[in-house]
């Protein structure tokens, strides 16, 4: 089973002090939600996260993306260039040269190319808490460096107890307009 390691926190993922440009990990659902609220934001609902990750909405997207198209992966039609354990193209279980400054785990935000809607790291890198789920179980989306590319597809949904605190789950905040 899992064991908690001394010194492994959101301030020090894998026991090494975090940098400002890293995803925040080792946070429970409630802690992530509190961090978003502190910034006047919130965790996205599942349908919001899915729309942002898979449905291109930009009026003039760059080459490789088409407005109104729903993509298989947050990076487009493949998981190429996302950061995951297997099936992410030229990364093959590793990040770009020099990106894994700890030697293991997630990479700094915006290390991989932008995907659907110009968003970074929606597929791979770290699972993201979404504000959907019943009771003590909450959903995560997007897959992570710890999982294969097939965990990044829209139909793949993971749930975890809301008090889960691990190095491969993070979050992103959204703001109502």
Residue positions per predicted region:
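Short, structured beta-strand segments at or near domain termini in extracellular proteins/domains
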Residues: 167-177
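Functional-site microenvironments in short loops/helix caps that host divalent-cation chemistry
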Residues: 1-158, 167
